[in-house]
Every structure is written in C-alpha cells, then in structure tokens.
Amino acid sequence: MTDAPDHHPADAAEKRLITETGVAARVAQIVEPSLEGLGFRLVRVRVTGQNGCTVQIMAERPDGTMTVEDCESVSRTISPLLDVDDPIGRAYHLEISSPGIDRPLVRVGDFARWAGHEAKVELTVPLEGRKRFRGIIRAPEGESVRIDLPDAKEGTPASYDLRLRDIGEAHLVLTDALIRESLRRGSAPVEDEEGEGEAPTAH
C-alpha cells in the first residue's frame, strides 16, 4: 500500500533538480528548448562509450507517457540540431527513450507523484556520515523529502529528511507495486523488453 497521490498532469515548465555536467550538459542545453516546443520534458542526458559513443536522451510528456512514435518524433527533430552544433565532436549513436518504470527522479514533482514507492537516493554531501539511501520516499515538504528505511538496524534512524538541493541522483526501484501503478497510470514503457522504448540513430 502506498501513499502516492492519484496521477495528475505535471507542470510542463518545472525545472529539474538534477542536471548534467560536461558534454551531456551541452547536449541538454541544445535539445531542451525543442523538446519543450514539441510538448515533452527532458528527463536526463547521458553520453557513454557504448558502441563507440552513444548519446542517450530520456524524455516524457508532462503526464509521464512516452510512446515509440514519440521517441521517433523527438529523434527527427533534435538530430539535425545536434548535427549543427556538434557538441560530441565525433561519430555517435543517438538513443531517445522513455524514463522506464524504474525511472530517474529529477524534479520535485517526480518525488511527489511517486511518493510511497521505493527509491535509491544519492546525495552530493553526506548526511550523518552517509550519502546513499534506499527506502520509501514521501511527498516533499518545503525544501526536503523524507525517506523511510524499512530495513534500518536497531539503534539507527528509521527515516531521514533529505534536502532536495543536496540530491545528486535518485531513481525508483523496480517492484511489483511500482509495475502495477505504472500500468494503471499508463506511464509504463512500450515495446521494449528492457523497459525503455528507443529510437536509435547513427551519426
């Protein structure tokens, strides 16, 4: 049983708490305005050494959905932009995908919409000597979000209030409850065995 609120459209203009650095940040800067123009929100950009070089862009509609057709539409739009600006500087593969069921949590609204579900959170600065937490997230209040630790050892805190500005990385943990809720909301990825619909393009 979760305390997650019923699904509702997110604020399309809500800024991300967690953003990229380096080349990935430059890619995000190039593609985000066009994504917003198409009615999508940027979730995350990653540049990896997979297949030589792969640029992975996660996006979604404000309601959390992202179809294979949406991925293809985004790819057609942003591919020419990246070719012109050339932030990578070498050949690369472009992959557009949905966030997946065990999605990254990059906005305050993400934590609110998935309150009551299990997540892994890593801080940029230690809190009481630790940076990594795994537990049930609660709806954010003010500048922080609470995480309950069901497996906390006796004599240690059963919950922590994490400052949102100190979160460096966060994502949901794949559970049966999360799968059921994602399907109910219609935000589960489609046509991909690994959980992310993709539209790969070579450059």
Swiss-Prot record:
Region annotation Disordered: where it falls in the sequence: 184-203
Pfam family, one: RimP_N
GO biological process terms held by the UniProt record: ribosomal small subunit assembly; translation
Keyword Plastid (UniProt): no
Compartmental location: Cytoplasm
Domain of life: Bacteria
GO cellular component, one term: cytosol
This protein's record includes keyword Cytoplasm: yes
Record's keyword terms, sorted: Cytoplasm, Ribosome biogenesis
Function: Required for maturation of 30S ribosomal subunits.
Family designation: Belongs to the RimP family.
Protein name in UniProt: Ribosome maturation factor RimP
Organism, scientific name: Methylobacterium nodulans (strain LMG 21967 / CNCM I-2342 / ORS 2060)
Lineage start: Bacteria, Pseudomonadati, Pseudomonadota, Alphaproteobacteria, Hyphomicrobiales
